[in-house]
């Protein structure tokens, strides 16, 4: 019943918005404005992948090869303007399906905007994520092949340990530390302070400060791995940003990928070369200190009985360079990003410590139809992913966008703790058909 009411509400709001060229419903008076915006995605995915064993072949609990996926977002922005100062709040509601967490739906926060710039208080999306440019920004479809692929299945493991892979061009602060999958409460990611300058002659800059990436919207602290004698038992309940891997013989490595005193910044430049040609350039980066050390421990069940050693993790240092060029109906985009040796230690990351990615895409749009081709290459600790995606979409009306997409991928690598392990490869093809609704 709740899902039916939510669907009816979205359809009613969307119908009002889609009738206009600007599909965002707005309620306003002389100095107060309320803007409603939302997104819903329905997608069906089919996959064919080699070297999958037993239940690794299942896309869902009881079905191989075929699965459905949904994603949603709904937000209300309330703002008031007094003497050229805009103050307000954006409140993002938790939907009944998987929440969309892109920078375009910049979660719940307070904002104050003047002619000198915009301040965001409590935003879960940092400046580098909002200002970063990648090749995928010009593509059709969703690029969501990774939702159906299994790159670390049983065949790819060694001594029970999984290899690490990257499937997108992203940074630590938005993907590695805190995601909704790692948070028990229905909250957003870490709280931040953001500042963005106004656009001046095509330039815009932004900077963010995050005191602790474990400080999410629903908790104020987090307990790391400790001994029984300290009065705290084991690891934190929420385990936000923490993963523990088993090395056998009762030994584990606990890696806390949370960051303290994290800064992210970005600079973009937009230039209209001619009536038909536009260029956008971006440089973004992140810096921060690891919250804790890597812990090598002896465990009995879920209890730590002895800490064998601790190792220092390297600082977070990451950057991304990106560009998008548009000429008439053609668009192309490219980006390169490096995370270096961020949050690694040689005692565990024995195969390799560097992470980088690059991607490029070309797109052509004619009327309501858009078609694109994208290539992505990632390397995480010398484990590589190559993916090529061909996608097309058709705009039925403003805000309603059916699409189809086919992707071929290859992942090659081994667990980072075992340099003696053989490097293994898995390949596959994913077909997607879906519909996006924005209002």
UniProtKB/Swiss-Prot annotation:
Source organism superkingdom: Bacteria
Q: Name one GO cellular component term.
A: membrane
**Pfam families, A to Z:** Porin_4
- Does Acetylation appear among the keywords? no
Q: Answer yes or no on keyword Phosphoprotein.
A: no
> Which GO molecular function terms does the record list?
porin activity
Keywords from UniProt, A to Z, are: Signal
Chain ranges passing through the membrane: none
Please state the span of the N-terminal signal peptide per the UniProt entry.
Answer: 1-19
Q: What is this protein called?
A: Uncharacterized protein RF_0053
